Amino acid sequence: MKMRTHSGAKKRLKVLSSGKVKKKSTRMRHLNSHMSSKTKRQLGKTSYVEDANMLQVRRCLVF
């Protein structure tokens, strides 16, 4: 069986030249009127995949 890149992962994640994996923060689509401006500002920034999850991400992004 062929190894394939996970379609959902390739749409949501980007591997940087340093080896880190960039991702968009969640919880910013809707139902955020009750959130403080500080929370919304922090969630708007990009974040990185934690080291504990890197093995699973590397398996999804084989190519």
From Swiss-Prot:
One of its GO terms (biological process) is translation. One of its GO terms (molecular function) is structural constituent of ribosome. Pfam families: Ribosomal_L35p (PF01632). Residues 1-45 are annotated as: Disordered. Keywords: Ribonucleoprotein, Ribosomal protein. GO terms for cellular component: ribonucleoprotein complex; ribosome. The keyword Transferase does not apply. InterPro entries: Ribosomal_bL35 (IPR001706), Ribosomal_bL35-like (IPR021137), Ribosomal_bL35_sf (IPR037229). The keyword Ribosomal protein applies. It comes from the Bacteria. Residues 1-43 have a biased composition (Basic residues). NCBIfam families: rpmI_bact. Belongs to the bacterial ribosomal protein bL35 family. This is Large ribosomal subunit protein bL35. It comes from Bdellovibrio bacteriovorus (strain ATCC 15356 / DSM 50701 / NCIMB 9529 / HD100). The gene is rpmI.
